């Protein structure tokens, strides 16, 4: 049996995978227009899922058990179990308190989505991207959220995680003189 979180962190801690799969992010340069960076980042995550043997789906809706619409940016389905094994949210982070709150909301989406899938996913990934130098997100807040659970906006109790790995990934872009963004650093670490 393979250590899936370690495989993911290995692939998403260097630029090698992205250089090979999505050079627009790391060597061609990309403009920060509309949702282009988001689309490319989600595509990169889907590509990694495919390379690791999963059926990767973009914007996959989770079962509607509590009334709120949630779609993970990338969902990796096990081809043998036919259930989601990995859920990913990819979000811009600007280094502000508002940005931290947005990442926390995305983490809550992952936790609730996992619950709605019957706790089938073995890995949840919160992936943030930023341009230029910004303050680092407070990862302790994320770990605490996973350990304590929360009450959703519609009143559903989302329990703490058990037997699920949580990874935090960062795509760090530099702003070039031309105004384009180039991915210069990637980080991936296990929170739980």
Segments predicted by a language model, with ranges:
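Hydrophobic, Leu/Ile/Phe/Ala-enriched alpha-helical segments that form helix-helix packing faces
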Residues: 12, 16, 41-53, 111-117, ...
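Short, well-structured alpha-helical interface segments that form or flank functional binding sites
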Residues: 36, 40, 44, 67-69, ...
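Active-site beta-strand-loop-beta-strand hairpin of nuclease catalytic cores
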Residues: 75-87, 117
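Acidic/glycine-enriched edge-of-secondary-structure segments
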Residues: 55-69, 82-102
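Acidic-basic catalytic patches of nuclease active cores, encompassing PD-(D/E)XK
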Residues: 1-63
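Core alpha/beta structural scaffold of self-assembling particle/tube/pore-forming proteins
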Residues: 73-76, 110
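Domain-level recognition of nuclease-like catalytic cores that cleave nucleotide substrates
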Residues: 126-192
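Catalytic cores of nucleic-acid endonucleases
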Residues: 93-150
């Amino acid at each position: 049996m393979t250590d899936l979180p370690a495989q993911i962190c290995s692939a998403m801690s260097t630029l090698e995978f992205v250089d090979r799969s999505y050079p627009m992010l790391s060597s061609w340069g990309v403009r920060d227009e509309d949702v282009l960076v988001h689309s490319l980042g989600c595509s990169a995550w889907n590509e990694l899922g495919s390379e690791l043997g999963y059926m990767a789906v973009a914007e996959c809706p989770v079962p509607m058990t509590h009334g709120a619409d949630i779609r993970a940016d990338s969902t990796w389905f096990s081809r043998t179990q036919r259930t989601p094994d990995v859920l990913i949210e990819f979000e811009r982070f600007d280094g502000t308190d508002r940005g931290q709150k947005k990442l926390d909301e995305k983490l809550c989406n992952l936790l609730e989505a996992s619950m709605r899938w019957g706790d089938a996913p073995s890995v949840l990934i919160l992936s943030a991207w930023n341009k230029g130098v910004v303050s680092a997100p407070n990862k302790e807040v994320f770990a605490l959220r996973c350990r304590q659970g929360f009450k959703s906006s519609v009143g559903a109790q989302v329990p703490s995680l058990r037997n699920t790995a949580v990874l935090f990934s960062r795509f760090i872009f530099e702003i070039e003189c031309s105004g384009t963004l180039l991915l210069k650093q990637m980080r991936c670490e296990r929170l739980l």
